[in-house]
């Protein structure tokens, strides 16, 4: 089986290509620098698969949220996410009309990747971002990484692989359209030698526009003091309503937090939203909940969350810090099919599949928020138990003294 392997390197300026690249008959080496991004894409054909469902697996390290994304990258949700439209719902997945989903902070790729994937990949979840699509006829694995100052990356064709490399710089771009230029190199299948590299250019419209490429961003924070009912504050006072656009907030909440749909009125809410059950009684049922809220421009928006009772611990501290990563997005219908022609973006499962194909997503903020939740300590169990029994005993004695003491006094009163 032939694997198609595409490598893309993006530099800041045209002169960087010549200064940071060298080659011979079989190998090409690129050198890193400030803001240099390396993308690898593997495309594997599937034959004889009986599974007709689609699955998307994404991973983005939380530290990556603070990094300025390039125009060949897509804004993914932080953490590990799996989306599937299979009729068989796996354990702990939540469902909506379009897909089933799972979200976690743990990179657990081997559990969800099909067994036929054997590329000897060196997974690096601490530094790399992954976007994987599993379809009935093919599997696509996309890996993003920074190529840092002084770091080198050498590319050469391996057996049964069709290799193509593009080395680009950003020629021009605005908030939606991108024009990149550079060179494209191919390797011959028979002897593994490089063909002559050709000049090339690409013009496309971005599906996801990173917040660092937007002219305006919004502040996103938790109202202080946080308490048991934390309030997310989204400041859109400097924004105006746009035609065919919606300001949205996308939330993936762990079990320790939940939305009261009768109080907050989300646009969409899937997963665990029970108002009474503690966190530990839901662990085997679902990972949490996913929701989308519509926000109003020109004002301060507020979304109230609620905390669940969590399982007591043994000397692990009196509070559990729960983290989540809200995404504030401006979703717009463009009426333009250029989005589908973007060579670095393919619309897949996830919240974007709930919108039309011509929708672009302008990311205004994505911030990690922390909620401290009080946690009982089992070492205090005896103290609490004995204290409760003592209070109960005193209460019983007091009640009996009042009832029987008053009756005795009344009987001892002498009537004239």
UniProtKB/Swiss-Prot annotation:
<feature type="glycosylation site" description="N-linked (GlcNAc...) asparagine">
    <location>
        <position position="120"/>
    </location>
</feature>
<dbReference type="GO" id="GO:0005783">
    <property type="term" value="C:endoplasmic reticulum"/>
</dbReference>
<comment type="similarity">
    <text>Belongs to the PIGX family.</text>
</comment>
<keyword id="KW-1133">Transmembrane helix</keyword>
<dbReference type="InterPro" id="IPR013233">
    <property type="entry name" value="PIG-X/PBN1"/>
</dbReference>
<dbReference type="GO" id="GO:0006506">
    <property type="term" value="P:GPI anchor biosynthetic process"/>
</dbReference>
<dbReference type="GO" id="GO:0005789">
    <property type="term" value="C:endoplasmic reticulum membrane"/>
</dbReference>
<feature type="glycosylation site" description="N-linked (GlcNAc...) asparagine">
    <location>
        <position position="212"/>
    </location>
</feature>
<dbReference type="GO" id="GO:0031505">
    <property type="term" value="P:fungal-type cell wall organization"/>
</dbReference>
<dbReference type="InterPro" id="IPR042322">
    <property type="entry name" value="Pbn1"/>
</dbReference>
<dbReference type="GO" id="GO:0036503">
    <property type="term" value="P:ERAD pathway"/>
</dbReference>
<feature type="glycosylation site" description="N-linked (GlcNAc...) asparagine">
    <location>
        <position position="24"/>
    </location>
</feature>
<comment type="function">
    <text>Required for proper folding and/or the stability of a subset of proteins in the endoplasmic reticulum. Aids the autocatalytic processing of PRB1. Component of glycosylphosphatidylinositol-mannosyltransferase 1 which transfers the first of the 4 mannoses in the GPI-anchor precursors during GPI-anchor biosynthesis. Probably acts by stabilizing the mannosyltransferase GPI14.</text>
</comment>
<dbReference type="GO" id="GO:0035268">
    <property type="term" value="P:protein mannosylation"/>
</dbReference>
<feature type="transmembrane region" description="Helical; Signal-anchor for type III membrane protein">
    <location>
        <begin position="386"/>
        <end position="405"/>
    </location>
</feature>
<feature type="glycosylation site" description="N-linked (GlcNAc...) asparagine">
    <location>
        <position position="85"/>
    </location>
</feature>
<feature type="topological domain" description="Cytoplasmic">
    <location>
        <begin position="406"/>
        <end position="416"/>
    </location>
</feature>
<keyword id="KW-0812">Transmembrane</keyword>
<feature type="glycosylation site" description="N-linked (GlcNAc...) asparagine">
    <location>
        <position position="365"/>
    </location>
</feature>
<dbReference type="GO" id="GO:1990529">
    <property type="term" value="C:glycosylphosphatidylinositol-mannosyltransferase I complex"/>
</dbReference>
<keyword id="KW-0337">GPI-anchor biosynthesis</keyword>
<dbReference type="Pfam" id="PF08320">
    <property type="entry name" value="PIG-X"/>
</dbReference>
<comment type="pathway">
    <text>Glycolipid biosynthesis; glycosylphosphatidylinositol-anchor biosynthesis.</text>
</comment>
<keyword id="KW-0472">Membrane</keyword>
<feature type="topological domain" description="Lumenal">
    <location>
        <begin position="1"/>
        <end position="385"/>
    </location>
</feature>
<keyword id="KW-0325">Glycoprotein</keyword>
<dbReference type="GO" id="GO:0016485">
    <property type="term" value="P:protein processing"/>
</dbReference>
<keyword id="KW-0256">Endoplasmic reticulum</keyword>
<protein>
    <recommendedName>
        <fullName>Protein PBN1</fullName>
    </recommendedName>
</protein>
């Amino acid at each position: 089986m032939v694997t198609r392997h595409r490598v893309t390197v993006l530099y800041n300026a045209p002169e960087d290509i010549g200064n940071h690249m060298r080659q011979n008959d079989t190998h090409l080496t690129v050198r890193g620098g400030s803001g240099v991004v390396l993308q690898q894409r593997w495309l594997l054909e599937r034959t004889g698969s009986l599974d007709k469902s689609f699955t998307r697996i994404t991973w983005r390290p939380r530290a990556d949220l603070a990094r300025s994304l390039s125009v060949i990258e897509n804004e993914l949700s932080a953490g590990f996410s799996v989306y599937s439209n299979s009729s068989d719902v796996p354990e702990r997945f939540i469902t909506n009309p379009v897909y089933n989903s799972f979200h976690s902070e743990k990179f657990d790729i081997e559990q969800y990747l099909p067994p036929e994937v054997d590329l000897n990949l060196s997974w690096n979840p601490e530094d790399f971002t992954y976007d994987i699509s599993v379809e009935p006829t093919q599997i696509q694995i996309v890996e993003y990484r920074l190529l840092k100052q002084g770091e080198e990356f050498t590319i050469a064709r391996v057996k049964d692989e069709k290799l193509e490399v593009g080395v680009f710089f950003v020629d021009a771009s605005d908030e939606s359209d991108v024009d990149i230029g550079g060179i494209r190199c191919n390797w011959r299948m028979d002897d593994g030698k490089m063909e002559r590299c050709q000049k090339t250019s690409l013009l496309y419209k971005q599906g996801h526009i990173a917040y660092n490429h937007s002219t305006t961003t919004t502040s996103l924070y938790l109202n202080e003091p946080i308490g048991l009912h934390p309030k997310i504050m989204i400041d859109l006072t400097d924004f105006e309503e746009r035609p065919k656009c919606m300001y949205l907030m996308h939330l993936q909440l762990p079990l320790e937090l939940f939305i009261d749909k009768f109080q907050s009125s989300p646009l969409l809410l899937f997963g665990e939203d029970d108002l009474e059950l503690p966190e530990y009684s839901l662990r085997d049922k679902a990972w949490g909940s996913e929701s989308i809220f519509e926000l109003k421009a020109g004002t301060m928006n507020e979304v109230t969350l609620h905390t669940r009772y969590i399982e007591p611990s043994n000397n692990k501290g009196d509070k559990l810090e729960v983290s989540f990563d809200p995404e504030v997005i401006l979703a717009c219908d463009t009426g333009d099919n250029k989005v589908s022609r973007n060579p670095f973006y393919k619309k897949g499962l996830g919240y974007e599949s709930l919108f039309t194909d011509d929708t672009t997503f302008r990311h205004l903020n994505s911030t990690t928020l922390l909620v401290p939740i009080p946690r009982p300590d089992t070492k205090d169990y005896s103290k609490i138990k004995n204290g409760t029994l003592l209070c109960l005993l005193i209460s019983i004695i007091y009640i009996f003294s009042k009832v029987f003491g008053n009756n005795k006094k009344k009987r001892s009163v002498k009537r004239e």
